[in-house]
Amino acid sequence: MKKKILLTIAMCLILSMGMTACGSKEKSTAVQSTNKVISVTPTDGYVAKPQEGYEQIMIFPKDKQDDNNTEYIQIDAVDPDGALNSLVGFTVKGYKQGTTNYTMDQLNADLDAKASEEKASGVVGTFDNKTSVKLGEVDYIKFDLTRNGVDANEYYGVVDGTPVYITVVGLIDKDGVSGMLNSIEYKIKK
């Protein structure tokens, strides 16, 4: 009888400690860009900051949010008026501001043209290793490269006829990054 009582008490303690531990974890909430075009849910240990005035979210490790150019994630989309305000604007020259009819074929052609342009100017390797990946609901063209002296990935995609862009610098193999990338959602106004 004593064994049953002790076993029951031990089970109750284990159950209550488990429930307390589960209940104390705070769930991350999605962060949205200026005009709510981009939404991403940062994982534990990361902070997401919308960039004021345009559709971009920057994500940093919590302990490296200031003056950090070697560990970050940058997510870009077009503004509601169709303007591109990021690096993707220099790469996707076939996109016409304010339109929503850009395609993956056009994106591939723009990326191939950018690779040719860079090779002609002596830059080698940036757009040479193109692979297709899916993050969340979006198909992307991914490149492995070096940015600011560290390994990086660039992702170019098309959502609702507009280009989107993600760069992951220095965090490509870190815990939680994959979950954040798969949590990205876009709401492009047509």
Regions found by a protein language model. Give the residues of each.
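Bacterial Sec-dependent N-terminal signal peptides
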Residues: 1-5
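N-terminal targeting sequences that direct proteins away from the cytosol to non-cytosolic compartments
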Residues: 6-10, 16-66, 168-190
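Hydrophobic alpha-helical context, especially transmembrane and signal-peptide helices
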Residues: 7-14, 128, 152, 156, ...
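Generic anion/oxyanion-binding catalytic loop in active/binding sites
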Residues: 11, 96, 166
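Generic hydrophobic alpha-helical membrane-segment signal
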Residues: 32-33, 125, 155
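Short, solvent-exposed coil/turn segments at beta-strand boundaries
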Residues: 41-45, 62-65, 81, 136-138, ...
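Conserved polar/disulfide-associated segments of primarily extracytoplasmic proteins
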Residues: 61-152
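Short, well-structured beta-strand
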Residues: 134-190
